[in-house]
């Protein structure tokens, strides 16, 4: 199940292709249980164990966007192919990777700064689109005690051969609204709470072409004349009319959750309430600068049924509504499409204790002395026999 975001089309078809997708496997996220936003990132594989973060020994397997394992490219002697390069006054060691299964046809590079050991990644697609991962400090998830142990490198920016570019910005977790008096938060410090970062804005549709000069002494920086802006509202934007700038306190979701697959705790306190899409045409009298064009409003199960006892444990996305906006003589006119509603198969839990007749115990395993000890393990079905 997928839900494409209503992004305004960019020039030459260069538009971030983003969609919400549902899969019951990944668990909870910033869109409730099962939903996630399909964005590009490079992360460490955790299916067979915790990451070791010994990158010089290739102790971990990297994954591109959760799909393909990346393997290092070797030279004729069997050693890793590496290339030194200095860009913007920083010396790097560049190593090269390719997907384990062919078909992506992309050049994938890991750039490690010689002086700090901090790395970022770069990929060049077969369509000549360059993408940088963890190029900005906030586009990563790292160990709070060691910033060189980066678990996930998220997309920072991308551009094509025609000068079209897109920039992604992230918001750091800063602990606003967290009730430290709760038992679940008692042993957490400000540093451990601030590991998670949240995608906040996506800018694209630059007026001036973007061609970064890798041989220049200093970096020119990203364009500032973006025509389109997508904002993820975590409840920190006003209701009517919302603006691109956060102007409300950051609310805490009803069921914060943690994952420790990175080898350290990554705790998520926020949840996306809606997407806001702005057009920036200052010369247009009917539009102007940062004009709200449309939104995608999300409703969760705890908002639909506040008294549901499952709310402190998990919440589901139950509806998504696309709304269009038009500015008419200073008045904001809105019109919404019918809501897209979602229903889920709920687990059937048997809270009672049932009795089993003696005739049905004949084929149950027993110990040598006729006594069987059982471990009561959560909701797993268990039979307790008394001899």
Annotate each predicted stretch with a short phrase.
Residues 1-387:
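Conserved catalytic cores of ATP-dependent inositol ring kinases
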